[in-house]
C-alpha cells in the first residue's frame, strides 16, 4: 500500500514536459504509434505535457486526430505557451499584436519581407511569414516547401548560416525593442516578445506546485528554441536527438526495470 501511495504522489507531483518537433516527432510529421503508446504508459506514472512553437492546430495534427491531443496530454502549451490548455480546457491565449503594437509589428514584417526579397536560394516557395498568436515564424524558403526541399534548405543552411545571418540582421535593426529570436526546426526561426520563449509556460505551472518538472528537447544549445526552458532552474533539462532517444531517456528515469528493452 505504501508503494501505491508513493506512486500516486509522484504522478501528481511530477511533470514530464516535451518539445514536439525532433523530440516526440520528426519535424512536422506525425508521431510514431509506438512513441504515442509509450507516452500513455508514462502517463500512468507522471503527468505529461507538450510545449511547442507551432500553433495548436499543427500540434494537434502531429500528436493525434482532431482534439485528441488535449485528452492524451495533461498540459498542451502551443506557441511557446501563449496558448494554454490544462486537462482538456483552454486556460488562456495571448496575442503578439496586442503586446507589440501595430507600428512595431509592421516594421518587423516589412524588414523581414525586404530582407528575404534579396535572398537567392536554390528554391523559394510560399508562406514566408506565418503570423501566430504568440510569435512570427519566419522561413526564408517558405513553409509550403516539400519534405525534400526542406532537407535541401536545411543542409544549405548548415553551410551558409542563412538563418543565423538573418537573425543577426534583425537583432541589429531592432535592438532595444524587446524582441527575441530563436532557431527551431529545419527551415525557420521565431520572433517573439522578450519573455515569450518556452519558459512562458512555466509561469502557469508554478501555481500547480510540482516537485519536479522534467523537460525534454532537441534544440537545447544557445540560440535553439528549447535552450531557455532547458536551462531554467525550475526544470530538470534533458537534451535528446530523436523521438526514440526521448523514449529511451524516459525508460531509464521512470521505468529502470525495462530500460534494457529499448
Curated annotation (Swiss-Prot):
Biological processes, Gene Ontology terms: cellular response to leukemia inhibitory factor; GDP-mannose biosynthetic process; mannose metabolic process; protein N-linked glycosylation
Entry annotated with the keyword Plastid: no
Expression sites by tissue: Strong expression in liver, heart, brain, and pancreas; lower expression in skeletal muscle.
Gene Ontology terms, MF aspect: metal ion binding; phosphomannomutase activity
Superkingdom in the source lineage: Eukaryota
Annotated metabolic or biological route of this protein: Nucleotide-sugar biosynthesis; GDP-alpha-D-mannose biosynthesis; alpha-D-mannose 1-phosphate from D-fructose 6-phosphate: step 2/2
GO cellular component: cytosol; neuronal cell body
EC class of the enzyme, as a word: isomerase
Regulation: IMP, a metabolite whose concentration is elevated in anoxia, inhibits phosphomannomutase and phosphoglucomutase activities and strongly enhances glucose-1,6-bisphosphatase activity.
Binding site for Mg(2+) 2: 230, 232, 235
PANTHER family found in the cross-reference section: PHOSPHOMANNOMUTASE (PTHR10466), PHOSPHOMANNOMUTASE 1 (PTHR10466:SF1)
Name recorded for this polypeptide: Phosphomannomutase 1
Source organism (scientific name): Homo sapiens (Human)
